[in-house]
Amino acid sequence: MTKSTYVELGEEKTSNQKGNMKRGVSILDFILRLIAIVATLASAIAMGTTDESLPFFTQFVRFRANYDDLPTLRFFVVASAIVSGYLILSLPLSILHIIRSSAGMTRVIFIILDTVMLGLLTAGSSAAASIVYLAHKGNRKANWFAFCQQYNSFCERISGSLIGSFIAIPLFIMLILLSALVLSRR
């Protein structure tokens, strides 16, 4: 009689440990989504509010640098905003996974949508990084001159806004791997 009691307790602990593991992964998923929201939203806001004006000869003639002048920086802002919106909309499902760890179909949806958002964020960040590099270094062969010496504040802000998006990229990779881990343990 005692042997069967031990076996039953052992089975309960194993299934309970599996449930605790899924719950822990779901909590980590939620935290990573919150961090990614902050990173992508801060990147979009920092880039979207970047502009600088420089006087030329007099106060009345000014040269202006704005993120909107370059289509790739516009794409970066739109991509980061879309990813932020997706992450905000995915929070209720992430909370559902904490409460009910057996929701497997939404994990598959998360893997697919997280992968799409990872691609979008990577494309926007890479495109913006190439323009930021050209702004800092220029390209002599194409007669593109580096303008960061003149527009120092503008260049610092657009460079800084890339940091958040490049933080969010590994977070998305971790989110995809966590969802795959939970599905494989199912």
Curated annotation (Swiss-Prot):
Extracellular side: 48-74, 129-161
Membrane topology: Multi-pass membrane protein
Cellular compartments per GO CC: plasma membrane
Domain of life: Eukaryota
Pfam family, one: CASP_dom
Main location: membrane
TM helices/strands, residue ranges: 27-47, 75-95, 108-128, 162-182
Record note on quaternary structure: Homodimer and heterodimers.
Function: Regulates membrane-cell wall junctions and localized cell wall deposition. Required for establishment of the Casparian strip membrane domain (CSD) and the subsequent formation of Casparian strips, a cell wall modification of the root endodermis that determines an apoplastic barrier between the intraorganismal apoplasm and the extraorganismal apoplasm and prevents lateral diffusion.
Protein name: Casparian strip membrane protein 3
The species this protein was found in: Medicago truncatula
Classification lineage: Eukaryota, Viridiplantae, Streptophyta, Embryophyta, Tracheophyta
